[in-house]
């Protein structure tokens, strides 16, 4: 599933191609995504100018002014590409947004777990966004807030870190990598975190995500950015997917367990 760095990479790639462009038409080949595509979407978008391309958690937010928004989620394997407007559609190319400059924005989603939603009003008023926690790269994510969010939580620290009510966008890959950088055992109870450890974890999450964004995200299977390029952060994983290999910090062996039904990778010698 595309995580925050991948969605931010797509947002950055879309921005210069979309901002200031007008939507001429929308082609919907398959409306049955995770939630049905608005049957009147083409009529609602035709003639509107894109004012902004933003991101909240793992959602792309395309704004047209006057509180008119498209909320896009890539699901498990979705992608959004900018292509010449005469590019023939392929299998799983479900929507095209035809622009006024000879290009289109194509939504591709083999598993149809993603979403393209029309919303009137502030984005944070949408039910999918209204209860999200702070952005990890913003000032709203700090040690004090993290400790407050984890107070009373006996679940594993990694599971809590992946909860969007605690902080948004820290998916499985980046939770593993952030906890390794912070030297924290993903299995320990979330409520056991000290103030100093919370500060270190905040910095590690920010540093890990910033590095991943700079590398264009991670491409493990099929992720591509808005112009079709893969990400490269997977080349720098310290622990994720490295069970039985040497820890880059101490030389011990990376172990694997399951927490919250997700594979978890860590160094038992380095992470306490």
UniProtKB/Swiss-Prot annotation:
Its EC number is 3.2.2.23, 4.2.99.18. InterPro entries: DNA_glyclase/AP_lyase_DNA-bd (IPR015886), DNA_glyclase_Znf_dom_DNA_BS (IPR015887), Formamido-pyr_DNA_Glyclase (IPR020629), FPG_cat (IPR012319), MutM-like_N-ter (IPR035937), Ribosomal_uS13-like_H2TH (IPR010979), Znf_DNA_glyclase/AP_lyase (IPR000214), Znf_FPG/IleRS (IPR010663). Keywords: DNA damage, DNA repair, DNA-binding, Glycosidase, Hydrolase, Lyase, Metal-binding, Multifunctional enzyme, Zinc, Zinc-finger. It comes from the Bacteria. Binds 1 zinc ion per subunit. GO terms for biological process: base-excision repair. A zinc finger (FPG-type) spans 238-272. The keyword DNA-binding applies. DNA binds at residues 92, 111, 153. Its cofactor is Zn(2+). It catalyses: Hydrolysis of DNA containing ring-opened 7-methylguanine residues, releasing 2,6-diamino-4-hydroxy-5-(N-methyl)formamidopyrimidine; 2'-deoxyribonucleotide-(2'-deoxyribose 5'-phosphate)-2'-deoxyribonucleotide-DNA = a 3'-end 2'-deoxyribonucleotide-(2,3-dehydro-2,3-deoxyribose 5'-phosphate)-DNA + a 5'-end 5'-phospho-2'-deoxyribonucleoside-DNA + H(+). Pfam families: Fapy_DNA_glyco, H2TH, zf-FPG_IleRS. The active site is at residues 2-3, 58, 262. SUPFAM superfamilies: Glucocorticoid receptor-like (DNA-binding domain), N-terminal domain of MutM-like DNA repair proteins, S13-like H2TH domain. PROSITE patterns: FPG_CAT (PS51068), ZF_FPG_1 (PS01242), ZF_FPG_2 (PS51066). PANTHER family: FORMAMIDOPYRIMIDINE-DNA GLYCOSYLASE. Monomer. Involved in base excision repair of DNA damaged by oxidation or by mutagenic agents. Acts as a DNA glycosylase that recognizes and removes damaged bases. Has a preference for oxidized purines, such as 7,8-dihydro-8-oxoguanine (8-oxoG). Has AP (apurinic/apyrimidinic) lyase activity and introduces nicks in the DNA strand. Cleaves the DNA backbone by beta-delta elimination to generate a single-strand break at the site of the removed base with both 3'- and 5'-phosphates. Belongs to the FPG family. NCBIfam families: fpg, PRK01103.1. This is Formamidopyrimidine-DNA glycosylase. It comes from Laribacter hongkongensis (strain HLHK9). The lineage of its organism: Bacteria, Pseudomonadati, Pseudomonadota, Betaproteobacteria, Neisseriales.
């Amino acid at each position: 599933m595309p995580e925050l760095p991948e969605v931010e990479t797509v947002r950055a790639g879309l921005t210069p191609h979309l901002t200031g462009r007008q939507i001429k038409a929308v082609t919907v080949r398959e409306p049955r995504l995770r939630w049905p595509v608005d049957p009147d979407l083409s009529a609602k978008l035709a003639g509107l100018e894109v004012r902004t391309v933003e991101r909240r958690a793992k959602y792309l937010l395309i704004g047209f002014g006057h509180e008119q928004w498209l909320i896009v989620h890539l699901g498990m394997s979705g992608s959004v590409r900018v292509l010449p407007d005469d590019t023939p559609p392929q299998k799983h190319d479900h929507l095209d947004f035809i622009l006024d400059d000879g290009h289109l924005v194509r939504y591709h989603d083999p598993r149809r777990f993603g979403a393209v939603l029309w919303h009137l009003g502030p984005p944070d008023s949408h039910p999918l966004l209204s209860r999200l926690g702070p952005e990890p790269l913003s000032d709203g994510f700090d040690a004090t807030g993290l400790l407050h969010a984890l107070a009373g939580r006996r679940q594993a620290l990694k599971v809590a870190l992946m909860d969007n009510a605690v902080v948004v966008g820290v998916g499985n890959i980046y939770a593993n990598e952030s906890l390794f950088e912070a030297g924290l055992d993903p299995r320990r109870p979330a409520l056991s975190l000290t103030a100093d450890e919370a500060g270190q974890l905040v910095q590690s999450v920010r540093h890990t995500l910033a590095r991943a964004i700079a590398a264009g995200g991670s491409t493990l299977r099929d992720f591509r950015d808005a112009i079709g390029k893969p990400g490269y952060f997977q080349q720098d994983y310290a622990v994720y997917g490295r069970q039985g290999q040497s820890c880059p910090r101490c030389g011990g062996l990376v172990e694997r367990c399951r927490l919250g039904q997700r594979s978890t990778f860590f160094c038992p010698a380095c992470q306490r």
